[in-house]
Amino acid sequence: HGGYKPTDK
């Protein structure tokens, strides 16, 4: 979701 991890879109 774009919080701390770019992969955790």
Curated annotation (Swiss-Prot):
Q: Show the GO MF annotations.
A: toxin activity
Which keywords does this chain's UniProt record carry?
Secreted, Toxin, Vasoactive, Vasoconstrictor
Q: From the Swiss-Prot or TrEMBL record, state where the protein is found.
A: Secreted
Biological processes annotated in GO? vasoconstriction
> Per the annotation, which location comes first and is thus the protein's main one?
secreted
Give any Gene Ontology cellular component: extracellular region
Task: Report, as the record phrases it, the tissue specificity of this protein.
Answer: Expressed by the venom gland.
**Which family, according to the similarity comment?**
Belongs to the ATP:guanido phosphotransferase family.
This molecule's function is given as: Vasoconstrictor.
Misc. remarks from the entry: May be produced from creatine kinase by limited proteolysis.
Tell me what this protein is called: Orpotrin
Gene source species: Potamotrygon orbignyi
